[in-house]
């Protein structure tokens, strides 16, 4: 379960997130739909500690993390979350397989097996030796999803 409490974030005078509260139960799939510029990306970035809000807490796995401060607990929280960005940030000079292996923190031999399994899971196993420039946008997105899944996150955040 993930619970966000009183999350607020401003950019200069513009308050983008104003005391956001939400609760997501294990197994839930939640979509956030709103017009451009209303804070969806900022919300995800704050949850994953890529942006630091003025205030707010996250409760996940029984642990409370003050999102407004960078500290050891927030780094631990990031280790159990995976995020796929709107722009996939694939390494252009690495194959699909190498891109998935990049984020794994296990021995090389094991990382290849895990990466292949996740590429297969997203329907990209036959493209393992292709570079991002030879993949469509949708295929690149599937490689990015495989990379996030390979880390076995407890929480997966998908941006568009």
Predicted features along the sequence, with ranges:
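The feature captures the beta-strand-to-loop junction immediately N-terminal to the Walker
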Residues: 33-35
């Amino acid at each position: 379960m993930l619970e966000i409490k009183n999350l607020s974030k401003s950019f200069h005078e513009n308050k983008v997130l104003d005391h956001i509260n939400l609760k997501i139960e294990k197994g839930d799939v939640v979509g956030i739909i709103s017009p451009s510029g209303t804070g969806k990306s900022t919300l995800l970035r704050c949850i994953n500690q890529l942006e630091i809000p003025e205030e707010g807490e996250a409760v996940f796995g029984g642990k409370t993390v003050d999102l407004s401060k960078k500290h050891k607990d927030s780094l631990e929280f990031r280790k159990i979350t995976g995020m796929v960005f709107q722009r996939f940030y694939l390494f252009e000079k690495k194959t699909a397989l190498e891109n998935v292996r990049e984020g794994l923190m296990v021995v090389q031999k094991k990382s290849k097996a895990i990466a292949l399994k996740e590429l297969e899971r997203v329907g990209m196993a036959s493209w393992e030796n292709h570079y991002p420039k030879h993949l469509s946008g949708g295929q690149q997105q599937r490689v990015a999803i495989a990379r996030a899944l390979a880390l076995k996150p407890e929480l997966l955040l998908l941006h568009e």
